[in-house]
Amino acid sequence: HWKNNNTRWDILNVARFCYAFKKDSSLSWVVDDNSKPIFKLDRLAPANGIEHSDAHDAMADVLATIGIAKIIKDSQPRLFDYALSLRDKNEVSKKIKLFSPLLHTSGIYPARFSCTRLTTALAYHPEYNDRAIVFDLEQDPSLLVELESDELKKLLFTKKLPKGVERLQIKELIFNKSPMFVP
């Protein structure tokens, strides 16, 4: 929670979640030339009959966000309520179990995977108690125990890896950023 008990909630993450799990929803989806979904408010709002001609204007963005939220709430009330519950970092914390699988939806994952990956929480962050370190289970987990720490560091933090070298798929799931996931 923030000042005055306010919370944050990114409706685009909820839209990604809807796309990944409820493709039959009443939202209309925009795709690029490669048939990958586009999750940008200035594209999603007009595709769903929501006025958004003044994209990136604060008030226009707020109204478009409310319009998308209303469509999701009206068409998928249980999913909407679940997503809304994830605004509470304590609720998120209760749902995260170390080494248990969870489907995590986030803009950090490629659209070609519906921004969703099967992950597991490896640990809670050593410095911040409001986040967990998650690992993408599509990647070979033996890398975590077989590689030396210098090699792990390289696979995590090198900006541009050599061609053919896959980045280690470890991300932070931050509890107070309304993460979208299903345990």
Placement of each model-derived feature along the sequence:
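Metal-dependent phosphoesterase core characteristic of DEDDh/y 3'-5' exonuclease domains
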Residues: 1-77, 86
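Extended aliphatic helical segments
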Residues: 14, 30-31, 62, 92, ...
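Acidic catalytic cores of enzymes that act on phosphate-bearing nucleotides/polynucleotides
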Residues: 85-170
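Sequence-level motif detector for i,i+2 pairs with an aromatic at +2
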Residues: 6, 129-132, 176
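Conserved non-catalytic scaffold segment of RNase H-like nuclease domains
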Residues: 1, 38, 42-51, 147-183
